[in-house]
Amino acid sequence: FAAEVVHGLPAAAALACADATLGMAAGERLSLPSSRLYHNSEVVGVQVGGALKNVIALAAGMTMGHGLGENARAALITRGLAEMARLAEAMGGQRTTLMGLSGLGDLLLTATSEQSRNYRLGLKLGRAGQSLAELTAATVTDVSNAASAQETVEGVGSAALLADLCQRYGVELPLAGAVQQLLTGQIPLAAVAQQLLTRPYRAEG
């Protein structure tokens, strides 16, 4: 999180650049004593990780907000990582990219901490059992919460774009799709776990 970097706490991140020479030079120049950058020339996978982890963080927050437990969150994060890798590969990236800082690392951070705007919104949605529109309408009536209601939550916009990507690349992303259904009020939160758990059996991957 940016606040921790500003305070000099240790951190690491991926720097995506197709030009390896330029990427290595930029990583070396931009790294700080307490913050290390690792060059990654696989730009597609880094981009997919950066976008989709926000959607999975929303889902993780909803899971905890609704009281579904730590086991459910761990399963969701793990299967969410699989969806990230699946989409990256379909778009021409590499699955292994998502095992690094821009995938697993960023996902663990964003999907478990209340410093994350996406996770915080998920918690609120899970506790309220409402769609995004319903929660926003209720929140902005409280002047003390109006500022937080206007926060930019990247996962909301990303979730809305995923249906098109799934169709274009022929990829199934059941968790990400469920988040969009929840945000738009197409399905109640109480029904989502049952919907996901009753999907046709398949091998892990």
Which positions does each model-derived feature cover?
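Internal alpha-helical scaffold of NAD(P)-dependent oxidoreductase catalytic cores
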Residues: 10-58, 62-97
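NAD(P)-dependent Rossmann-like dehydrogenase/reductase catalytic/cofactor-binding core
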Residues: 53, 57-64, 68, 89-99, ...
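Glycine-/Pro-rich loop/turn segments that contact NAD(P) or position catalytic residues
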Residues: 1-3
